[in-house]
Every structure is written in structure tokens, then in C-alpha cells.
From Swiss-Prot:
Involved in the restart of stalled replication forks, which reloads the replicative helicase on sites other than the origin of replication. Can function in multiple replication restart pathways. Displaces ssDNA from a PriB-ssDNA complex. Probably forms a spiral filament on ssDNA. This is Replication restart protein DnaT. Residues 151-179 are annotated as: Disordered. Homooligomerizes. Interacts with PriB. Component of the replication restart primosome. Primosome assembly occurs via a 'hand-off' mechanism. PriA binds to replication forks, subsequently PriB then DnaT bind; DnaT then displaces ssDNA to generate the helicase loading substrate. It comes from Salmonella arizonae (strain ATCC BAA-731 / CDC346-86 / RSK2980). One of its GO terms (biological process) is DNA replication, synthesis of primer. The gene is dnaT.
């Protein structure tokens, strides 16, 4: 349940301790915010209002629709671990860099702040699959590190603009200009 109940009825803790039945009876909505030392301390709620809140919470905890979506749309299938081939090999769809790829890339002089995204890896694999070249696993990782570094720095470190977004004019007039 939410810990905040918005109410316009506010009372000091001393007045509540003096006669809590009268205070709650006068409240609108059955709730009173109780302040101590000019700061909110807690809320006092009538039993009827508490029952309403619990019923509302129970109602909201159940979905309003009986449509159940298949779990296969939300769960990625577990991929079997693919062993790294020995020697040189052509790029294949299930290729993955090592778990400590960012550390290795830093040793090669390529500082990657963020890990390689699935999109970057997919683009790299698609390109090199079409090329058909063969390299050792470590060479593929070096190529991936350089490829990611170049693609990320091509836009000055800024994220690429969405070509589908519609630009909006700036209506702000800088100081010193007339509008």
C-alpha cells in the first residue's frame, strides 16, 4: 500500500493525543495528517477508511483483463555456450567476445566506457560474416574493439540522431535580441 495518503486535514500530535475520536470524526475522508515539530509524523485513519483503502489495493492488485500473454514473448531462450574454435575461423552468428572484453580492449588501447551492445555486436558479426575472412578469436575481439570505438566516436561521442524524429523550433529569444 502507498505510504502517502493525501488529505487536507492536518493536526498536531498533542491535539490527537488529547481526543483522537473527535479528531477522526471531524475529518473529511476519514484520514488526518499528524504533525510533530512542524513536520509530518504519520497519518491517523479511521477503520472504515482503512477498509476502503485495503479493498482498493486488493482490486488494483488483480489485472483488469483476462488476456494472458504467452511467456515466450517475454523470455529470451537460453543460448547454449559455444566453445571458441581453435586456430583461425570465419565469423559465425553465435560468436561472442570474452567476458572480460572491456578490460582486454583497454589493454589494446581502446577504452570502452560501456559494454558492447547487442546491436553493435550484431552489426559487426553481419559485416564480417559477409566478408568471409578468417582470424583468430583474439583478432576478432581486437577488430570488434576498434569497430565499436570508431562507430561511437564518429558522432563526437553524442548518440546518433533519430532520423524519424521531427525537429521542433526553439521559441526562446536570447537576451539582447528582439522578438
Amino acid at each position: 500500500m502507498s505510504s502517502r495518503i493525501l488529505t487536507s486535514d492536518v493536526i498536531g500530535i498533542d491535539a490527537l493525543l488529547h481526543d483522537h475520536h473527535a479528531v477522526l470524526a471531524k475529518s473529511t475522508g476519514g484520514a488526518v495528517a499528524v504533525f510533530a515539530n512542524n513536520a509530518p509524523a504519520f497519518y491517523a485513519v479511521t477503520p472504515a477508511r482503512m477498509a476502503e483503502l485495503l479493498a482498493l489495493e486488493e482490486k488494483l492488485s488483480h489485472p483488469g483483463s483476462d488476456v494472458a500473454l504467452d511467456a515466450q514473448f517475454y523470455e529470451e531462450p537460453e543460448t547454449a555456450h559455444v566453445a571458441i574454435p581453435c586456430g583461425k575461423f570465419a565469423m559465425y552468428p553465435a560468436w561472442q567476445p570474452d567476458a572480460d572484453f572491456q578490460r582486454q580492449a583497454a589493454l589494446w588501447g581502446v577504452a570502452l566506457r560501456d559494454p558492447v551492445t547487442a546491436e553493435e555486436l550484431a552489426a559487426f558479426i553481419a559485416y564480417w560474416q559477409a566478408e568471409g575472412k578468417v582470424f583468430h578469436h583474439i583478432q576478432w575481439q581486437q577488430k570488434l574493439a576498434r569497430s565499436v570505438q570508431i562507430s561511437r566516436s564518429s558522432n563526437g561521442g553524442m548518440p546518433q540522431r533519430d532520423i524519424n524524429s521531427v525537429s521542433e523550433p526553439d521559441n526562446h529569444i536570447p537576451p539582447g535580441f528582439r522578438g
